[in-house]
Amino acid sequence: MKYNDYLEHLELREGNEECVYLDSLGKPTCGVGHLLTERERQVYQVGDEVSEEQRNAWLEQDAAMAWEAAAQQIEDLGIETAEFIIVLGSVNFQLGTRWMDKFPSAYKALKNKDYDEAIRQVSTGSGKDGQSKWKEQTPVRVEDFVTAIDKLR
């Protein structure tokens, strides 16, 4: 079942932290990469432990939103490879469901089936050593996406 594979992939890449911590951008986060809302930040402070039940509820909500966005994007992109949704869902989970606003040229290249250009667009940029800031911060996540794009050929 693809959705369960997707959830396992998210937990593998994000971890499942029991306590609230600051992510690489300094934002309070907990569970499987859940960014705390303003309301949640009033309840939970950095270092606070959060119940497994609450963390699972956040995961269900966040993962479903990213999965739905990925499904719509796959349809828009005309991609028929079923496995691609796992990684594209992960991209939506990490970068947000409007990730293509951050990487418009990559999205356009995917739509045009120009996979070399899509890979270049997500890999290079204004970050350290000419790589994208996304790749600089989370190289394994970018490599997941690059590998999935490469398999579309």
PLM feature segments, named:
Residues 7, 27-29, 85:
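A residue-level signal for beta-strand positions that form part of recognition/binding surfaces
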Residues 29-31, 87-90, 117-121:
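Structural recognition of the beta-strand scaffold that forms the well-ordered cores
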Residues 29, 48-52, 109:
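Short, low-complexity, polar/charged sequence segments that are solvent-exposed and flexible
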Residues 43-76, 82-86, 92-104:
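Alpha-helical segment that forms one wall of the substrate-binding/catalytic cleft
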Residues 22-44:
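Substrate-binding/active-site groove segments that recognize
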Residues 1-17, 34, 56-60, 67, ...:
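Long, amphipathic alpha-helical surface segments
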Residues 9, 20, 25-27, 90, ...:
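N-terminal hydrophobic or amphipathic segments with adjacent small-residue motifs
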Residues 2, 21-24, 80-83:
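Extracellular/periplasmic catalytic domains that process cell-envelope and extracellular macromolecules
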